[in-house]
Regions:
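Short alpha-helical Gxxx[C/S/T] motif in the catalytic ATP-binding
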Residues: 162, 166
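Core structural elements
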Residues: 119, 188-189
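Bergerat-fold GHKL/Histidine-kinase-like ATPase
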Residues: 1-116, 151, 155-161, 171-186
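Glycine-rich/acidic phosphate-handling loop/turn and adjacent ATP-lid/helix
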Residues: 118-154
Length: 189
């Protein structure tokens, strides 16, 4: 009997099938714009009104993350360019969060968007030293096949350049440097 790989199931399966293999699988996106409200909007993998898989989550959430990004007028040849370095950095950050999650971990993945920042949190520890990740050149994805699937649609490069690029883009924007934290019980980044 044929069946998908774990990466195929996570990327393209339905949530009700995914949780049979990954019991704690849960993807959660929250917009928190009002301090008096738990969330202004929320998308969760278990809602039942969409597939709940990683691939569909990526595109639903990426489109939410970029809504407030300014796009200055720029032409390349005769075509308008709407893709900025900030867009590229957000794609990289979101893909990194998804492909480096430990889907067997005890807690789900959470993306939190507030007026003044974005927090991305996934189950699992950081697989390389943080200083090495910031310096670049080291790629050790937890879910390499998922990363390859993203690479096939031009998201990510598997060159270990994503985190340094995110820091560079934030610096060029004059924003505070991103922060990384690692919690060990339960493992969370």
């Amino acid at each position: 009997k044929k069946h998908p790989t774990s990466a195929g199931l996570l990327m393209f399966g339905n949530e009700y099938d995914i949780v049979r293999e990954f019991n704690a699988y849960f993807l959660d996106y929250q917009e928190q714009y009002d301090a008096d409200t738990r969330w202004t909007d929320r998308i969760i993998s278990s809602s039942g009104d969409w597939s709940g898989n990683v691939y569909d989550f990526y595109f639903r959430i990426y489109n939410r993350l970029i809504q407030d990004i300014k796009v200055p007028f720029r032409m390349d040849g005769g075509n308008r360019v709407d893709d900025t370095p900030v867009h590229q950095a957000l794609r990289e950050a979101l893909a990194n969060c998804l492909v480096n999650a430990d889907y067997y971990g005890r807690q789900g993945l959470v993306i939190l968007k507030k007026r003044d920042g974005i927090t991305m949190s996934n189950p699992g520890s950081f697989r390389i030293e943080l200083d090495a990740a910031k310096s670049g050149g080291v790629s050790d994805p937890r879910n390499g096949t998922m990363l390859k699937m993203f690479n096939l649609i031009d998201i990510g490069e598997r060159a270990g350049s994503g985190i340094p690029n995110i820091f560079r883009v934030w610096r060029e924007q004059g924003w505070a440097a991103p922060t990384f934290t690692e919690q060990l019980e339960p493992e969370r980044t």
